[in-house]
Amino acid sequence: MVAAKKTKKSTDNINNKLQLVMKSGKYTLGYKTVLRTLRNSKAKLVIISNNCPPLRKSEIEYYAMLAKVTVHHFHGNNVDLGTACGKYFRVCCLSIIDPGDSDIIKTTGEQ
């Protein structure tokens, strides 16, 4: 029961930090633009939803490994990730180029 509360709190924490990035930072949504930012070494953090297709997930992880970028696996499906971003559509993956006022890169790197 304690572990469930901890994951709920960490999920809420990530959601709040993600909303702050959406307001004050720079980001890209979608598979093609995430790969483009990884190839150009512009991404600082990549977030992947829980139900991202395995081939896409492995390709993003490969490019992130080459670019030495942290990959965070979101504990929800693509609908939840889209809602956390404040969008009304599904988001499979997103890359954060500039976190703005948020410290999401530090907190996801520790986990």
UniProtKB/Swiss-Prot annotation:
The lineage of its organism: Eukaryota, Viridiplantae, Streptophyta, Embryophyta, Tracheophyta. This is Large ribosomal subunit protein eL30. Signal peptide: none annotated. Belongs to the eukaryotic ribosomal protein eL30 family. It comes from the Eukaryota. HAMAP family: Ribosomal_eL30 (MF_00481). The gene is RPL30. It holds the Pfam family Ribosomal_L7Ae. Gene3D superfamilies: 3.30.1330.30. It comes from Oryza sativa subsp. japonica (Rice). One of its GO terms (cellular component) is cytosolic large ribosomal subunit. GO terms for molecular function: RNA binding; structural constituent of ribosome. Disulfide bonds: none annotated. PROSITE patterns: RIBOSOMAL_L30E_1, RIBOSOMAL_L30E_2. Keywords: Ribonucleoprotein, Ribosomal protein.
